[in-house]
Amino acid sequence: MSRLALNRYSRCFSRLKTLTTPLFFSSSAASNRDGDYQIGPPPIRVGLTESAGRAVFATRKIGAGDLIHTAKPVVACPSLLKLDSVCYLCLKKLMGSAKFEDRGVSYCSQECQENSKGFLDVETRADWSSFDDYCRTHNFKYPLMVKRLCCMIISGARPADCLDILQPAVLSSEMISKIEDGYGLLWNAFRKANFKDDDVAFLTKQWYTAILARIRINAFRIDLVGGSCGEDLLSLAAASVEGEGAVGHAVYMLPSFYNHDCDPNAHIIWLHNADARLNTLRDVEEGEELRICYIDASMGYEARQTILSQGFGFLCNCLRCQSTD
């Protein structure tokens, strides 16, 4: 998900039907640019549109640059390339010797170490070498998130249906074939570790495929704005452009309801860890839909449409794309 954006247009939207489904997410109240927190819930609501499904709308006017809300991930997972340099739970970059180690992984704080104990107890019972090699060889990132979610479910930290409310991606037959390979490796790792049948009863091929389909279209790539002390800012920027700056990926509940626009009025950023911050890019009026850009908004029209079609399954019809800008 890109943080780059332009801001030009305001929009009018179709009639809404407010969602009554309870949402599984953690978010804070909004604050202004000076960081003063306001009393009450975030100034947004989730509704349904006739054309784009779920959407997020402002319940009052929100100023340019204001924090809309924050959100903690339902599941977050570090990149295999970053296992030695970021916190195993929150993905914060580790600062030299200031880290806490437990069974071969590192954390930024004792709090993260304690909060990870449940799923780490499950994870360390199994041998993941074949599964990790499979992900590393094919450069797969989302199966690693499923692995972590499975460990969280077995430990009781998450219910097996925690992502069911999210929209799934449409998977090709080729993708499904590759998914089956990953499922077999994941299932065998738990089976060989002698987990009870009741503990892994949820882990069917159907569940695995459905979870991957949801993670694939809803996962955010975590590019941290704040680096470790002493890191060269130019190097950080170059790594981000090349895609090497990502510390991992995460799935959120409320941020996943934001629709896309190539000229968004909001964006999502990560300052120091996987806790997401949604900010406005310009003034937003009461009742206006809040939209973010799923990709690099600096790309040309054809490139944007290709990536959105292949990666997210839709062609963008925002005002910017209508003008083929």
Swiss-Prot record:
What's an example GO cellular component term for this entry?
Answer: nucleus
- Protein name as it appears in the record: Histone-lysine N-methyltransferase ATXR4
- List keywords of the entry alphabetically: Chromatin regulator, Methyltransferase, Nucleus, S-adenosyl-L-methionine, Signal, Transferase
Q: Which superkingdom is the protein from?
A: Eukaryota
Q: Which InterPro entries match?
A: H3K4_H4K5_MeTrfase (IPR050869), SET_dom (IPR001214), SET_dom_sf (IPR046341)
Biological process, per Gene Ontology:
methylation
Q: Which reaction does it catalyse?
A: L-lysyl-[histone] + S-adenosyl-L-methionine = N(6)-methyl-L-lysyl-[histone] + S-adenosyl-L-homocysteine + H(+)
A single Gene Ontology molecular function, please?
Answer: histone methyltransferase activity
The free-text function statement in the UniProt record for this protein reads: Histone methyltransferase.
Which PANTHER family does the entry link to?
A: HISTONE-LYSINE N-METHYLTRANSFERASE ATXR4, HISTONE-LYSINE N-METHYLTRANSFERASE SMYD
Give start and end of each SET domain.
Answer: 42-295
Q: State whether keyword Methyltransferase applies.
A: yes
Q: Where in the cell is it found?
A: Nucleus
| E.C. code | 2.1.1.-
Q: Which PROSITE patterns match?
A: SET (PS50280)
Main localization of the protein? Answer: nucleus
Family statement? Belongs to the class V-like SAM-binding methyltransferase superfamily. Histone-lysine methyltransferase family. TRX/MLL subfamily.
Return the SMART domains for the record. SET
* Annotated source species: Arabidopsis thaliana (Mouse-ear cress)
The positions making up the signal sequence are 1-30
Q: Does the keyword Hydrolase apply?
A: no
Q: What class of enzyme is it?
A: transferase
